[in-house]
Structure formats: structure tokens, C-alpha cells
Amino acid sequence: MVIVESPGKIKKIEEYLGQDYTVKASIGHIRDLQDNKLSIDVENGFRPEYVVPADKKKIVYDLKKSADKAQTVWLASDADREGEAISWHLMETLGLDPAKTRRIVFHEITKTAIQEAVNNPRQIDMNLVDAQQARRVLDRLVGFELSPVLWKKIQPKLSAGRVQSVALRLVVDKEKEILDFIPTPYYMIEGLFITQKTSSPLKAVLEKRFASEDEARAFLTDCIGASFVVSGIERKESVRVPAAPFTTSTLQQDAARKLHFSVSTTMRVAQSLYERGLITYMRTDSTNLSSLALGTAKKFITENYGAEYSRTRQYKTSGKGAQEAHEAIRPTFIDNTAISGTAMEQKLYNLIWKRTVASQMADASVMNTTVKIDCDKRPERFSAQAVTILFDGFLKIYMESSDDAAIQENETVLPEISVGEKLSANAVNALCKYTQPPFRYSEASLVKKLEELEIGRPSTYSPTITTLTSRRGYLVKGDKEGKKFQVTNLSLKGSNISSSVKTETVGAEKGKLLPMDIGIIVSDYLKANFPGIMDYDFTANVEKDLDKIANGELAWNNVISSFYYPFHKKVEESITDGQYNRVSREIGVAPDGELIVAKFGRFGAYVQKGDPEKKQFATLAKGQLIESLTLEEALKLFDLPRNLGQIDGADVIVTKGKFGPYLRFGDKNIALPRGVDPMKISLDECRGIISQAQEKTAVNPLIAEFKDGEIQVLNGRFGPYIKSGGNNYKIPRGVDAVSLTQEKCQEIIDSAGNEKKRPARFRKANK
């Protein structure tokens, strides 16, 4: 009997091993720490208290039943620390006899690899198990002790983690860096010249930038009637070297850049390719290729491209904490240039195939040419550059970087030209640009940064980002429009200087990780109160200690002990100190003299106008942050309510509350669909929204259901309400029942639960 992690591997492995073997799947871990308690005996060496979750009990029962009948049990979980721990948990939980139990590992699902693994079994490596156990215990201690601090000081249901909180800090710090950035205008000068000998066009850029329109205009004025001459030509040959085969992080980065895959999509598709036996194991720090893969690649390249394109290379893994002796991610068979499968599988496989083959190809040789152009009336020089490919080498099949892409896309043949040749200026343009702020992190660039800082490991990158974006709502993946500036461009043609007004956009980005207000608040609090946890070096040093545990150099519980006691003391101090002041920022004073304040409450960020006696509220618009909100933007949020007219004799009013924009139609409140601008919506659009809401509530007494019926949103005689645990909860005014999520329902229930139970039929939720 062979036990693997994923059922997707069963068919292939059974096919390779034959009738004497039965393959079963554990479907990941079969036991873990309990969800609702610390589950760690701190007083006795941090001993974990493992349990079999309810959804794994049948799997454990079936595995034990099969194992008892088997002559030999082969534990074939994945070849990493998590996989080693899974094998150990199987051994312990199933009560396997060590005499008839073998541990086998393979890095690809091929007949050769499987048979070699069976022929070379080993014992479970307890150093690897201890390293995984140390990480699990450490992460549980951090999360279990820090999260309640956030619940008390900021808001319920928040979480913190050893890796996730540091990743959050990276994104938040980058956002603050961008907010502090002040765009500065400058002028770049572009010359469009004509050669004397061949009358060919030649574009060149002035090597100096000008700070103002006046300086740029003065330069163009001096160019009137000026002579331009080629003062120098420099040619320099250089080589481009192919990138190493993929590791987990470089695959995630390249798939994001070239295929626009999210990190989680890349890992899901790679898992499928691995289970189908098409690629090697997809969680690896290694850039090594096996001798068999090197030989196969050399043969393929020589036969298909020629011997001059082949160059065998063995790359050294750069990461200091690279884990077990995996290979890089590569096709199991280089000859398989294409595969069947989904479009995503085909695209990712093609990317992996090209990267692997390119890594074993010759360098590309290019010629870089720079032409210098002098003006007799000014000391500044123009410069024109061109790139010519002399030998394409690995570029024949694969481009890794933007530099490589630029070589092929911008390969330029300069006109025949010589030093001393005079040029005529067809036009000289002064283009106003702005300095650009730092780029925000994309999923892929965040993974790259985490890897550079040695934070996390291949198996943690994807779940960390998923936790921050999907489960916690600290980050959102989205676009930024950027700031728009009106600029004046100048153009010299002949002796005439003309001007034109254009719009220059600064800081526009697509598909980047954007911090939400709650993410900024949590990051700032943790950085101020738990600087050790949020320190990049601390998190990286933990990874190094885990590597030492895996190598048998450190005892795992000693590592935990040295961290835990100082950390626990700080947690206790934070719990007992004064109430954390929830975020509140004065924005300014409205024209009517009322103070405008931005705050963060139970239902998110909002602005408040006026004193407690007659205050007004408005939620922040999508993309707005408390930290960067201006007075002008805040005042626009109070332009609501808008009366759009009547439908069926009832007023239709667009307004906004703590819970977002909604329609007030008669005595009904209907939430606006996500993405609808309350300042631009028309009466006709409202008609459709109202009609849909009426149809849904009229035909469906059950509006929504969550957690297998534990939470229900229902229509009653007095309107929609929430039912949970035998109790009914009123839905706060301004909240549309149709748009409620499980999280929002839970917040309403929690809010009502904090009040003293009333004798009435309903518990009233806090407004």
C-alpha cells in the first residue's frame, strides 16, 4: 500500500507500480492542532496536542483498514518538510509497524522516478519533522496570542501571523512611501534628425533634463539656426545570459508577468501538471537539474537548433536557506514540447518548457551602438542608441527579463552614418514629464521581495497572499488611476516654436496590491507595539533557525522557548494597558464651520461632520484611505442624499450611510450594487435595481444562507431579518438584506450579542 497526499496522483502511480500495489491518498494532513484552543503544552516543552479533525476521521479509518491488510506500507507524501510531517503523522495515527513501513520520496511522477524511490526507501527524517513542527507551533503561538490583542485594541475577527504581518507591513510601508512622494515636473528634449548622406531619420534624446518650461524654451530658441553634427560613434559587444530554471518564486513571478496568472492560480495549475506527471515538484528553492535532464536537454537542443545553440549549465541555488535537495521545476520529458489539457495548463507548461530549455542554451550576443550628436550653440549632447542581435542564442525561444524583450522588440538598424557628418533637425521637441513614485507591489513582486528578505518559503508565499487578500481583507488587488497634470509641451520646427497642452498621468497602476484602511491600522499597531515580530531580520532569522533544525543543528523546542517568553510578556503588557485609540484623523473644516473627521469603525472607514449632537456620516469611496483623504474629497462625500424623482409615486433618494451607498425607496432601503457610482446613477438605472430587489424578496422568503444553514437571512412580516442559533436579529437601517455577506451577518449578530438580552422577539443590533 502506497499513501500519497493527493488523489490526483493515484492513477499514474498505480499504473507505474502494477497490480501488487494499492495507492491511497491522505488528502494533505490527517491531524493538526485544534482550531479553537492553543493546543500547545507550553509548560512541557511546547508539546503540540494534535487531533484528527472531523472531516478526516473517515479518511483515517479507511487508511488504517487498508494498512492493516497490507504487507508493506510506503509513505510517499511530498518531498519537503510538510510532506515529511504528514508521513510521521500517518505513522503515529495509523499505528503503523516500523518493520513493515517505508518512507519514499520522488520529485517527478514518472515510471523511472517511482521505481527508483521504491528501490531506495529510507526512514522518516525526524529533523525535517521537527522543523515543520517548530514552524507550526511558532505560527500558532504568534497568531493565537496576537490576534486577541487586535480584537481588544482595534476590532473583532482580526488576525496576525509571523509571515503574513511582515508581508502586510511591506505593502503598507510602500503605500506610505508613495503617499509621501511629491511628483516633480521636468522637460526631456527629443531631436528628430535627418542624415545628410542617405536622408534617413534618426531619433535622439538630449542627455540633460530641464527643470522648467522656461529652460526648455531657452534651449529650443538656441537651436534655431544651429548646426548639428555627429561627434562620436561607440560600438560595444555584450552578451545576455539565460536565467536559471524555475524555482517556485521565479515561476510565480514569470507567470504573473507573461501570463497574468495570480500566485494562487500558478500553484493550482502547477499542482495539476505535477500530478499528471508532466513537471517535477513545484515547491522548491532549487535551480539544479538532474544529470539525466541535462543530457536530454543537450540532445534536444543539438538536434533541433544546432550544436552552436547548446551550452550545458548547472546553476547554483542562490538562497541561503534552500531546503531539501529538490530539482528545479522542469518538464519531466524535454521531448514533450506541447501537452493536452486546459488552456492554463498548456500556457504554464509552455513557459516551464521554454525556461528549462533556454537555461541550457548558448548566450545571446548583441551589439550596442551609441551615437553622440553635438549642437554648435549649446554644450549639451544628444544621444541615439540602438541594439543589434549578432547571435540570438537562448533568445530564440525565451525572454526572461524586460531587457531581453527590449532587445527583440526594439532591435534597431541605424542608418549609415559617420563621425563628422552633419544632420538637419526636422524637429526638436520639449516634452514635459513628471517623476514617478515607487511602484506598488504586485503579487509576483511581493513574492520576489519576500524571497530577497528570506522571509517564508516556497510553500508559504501563495497562502500568505491569499490570507491577506481574501480571508482578512487587509489588502485588495486592484487598480490606481493616478494623478493627472496639465502640461505644456513645446516643439521647434524650422524657426517656429509652438506649444500644446497635454495631460500627464502620474502613478497609474493596474493589478497591484492595495492596502485597505484596516490593513494600515493593523500594521501600524503591530509595528508600534510588537516591533520584534514586524522586523524583517527577525522573520528571516526564524527561517534560518528552522533550516538549522532541519539539518539537526538545533533542538526545535529550544528555538521556540527563546522566542516565546519575551513575546508572551509583551502580549500580557499590551492586553492590560489602556484602550487603544481607534484611528481618528482631522481632515479640516467645512465651509459652514463644521469639523470633518475621518474615522474607522466596526463597519469600516467613514467621515463624520459636525459635533455629537447633529453629526452626519458618509463612508469613504472605493480606493480612498483615511491616511490620504483630502478635505475636498471628504466634502464631496456629503453631497448625498440626491432625490432623483419618483417611481410609482414614491421618492427615490440616493444616500449614504456607515454601511455604504443605498437607495431609499418609500420605506425600503436597497443597497447599490458594487461599482455603481451614487453621484452618477440615473432614475432609470434605479428602476432596474429596485425591480430586481422586489422580485428577489417577493419570491424568496429565504434571501441568503451561510455556514450550512447556521445563519439565514429571511423575509418576515416586518421585513428582512437574520436568524441564527434560534435567535432573530434586526438588520440595521441602511443595510440591504440582499447584499449581506456571511461576515457582515456575523458582525450584526456579534453586535447584538453584546447587548443585554431583551424580552422582545428581536434582539436589536447596534447601529
Placement of each model-derived feature along the sequence:
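C-terminal or mid-to-C-terminal helical accessory/interaction module adjacent to the motor/catalytic core
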Residues: 109-191, 235-239
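Basic, low-complexity terminal or inter-domain segments flanking catalytic cores
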Residues: 12, 147, 180, 263-264, ...
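Glycine- and acidic
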Residues: 70-74, 152-154, 231-238, 249-257, ...
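Metal- or metallocofactor-binding catalytic centers and their adjacent structured scaffolds
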Residues: 210-245, 252, 418-422, 431, ...
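A conserved hydrophobic secondary-structure block that centers on an alpha-helix together
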Residues: 78, 254, 258-265
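Short active-site loop/helix that positions an aromatic residue
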Residues: 12-16, 88-89, 168-178, 354
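Intrinsically disordered, low-complexity regulatory segments
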Residues: 1-136, 142-145, 306, 402
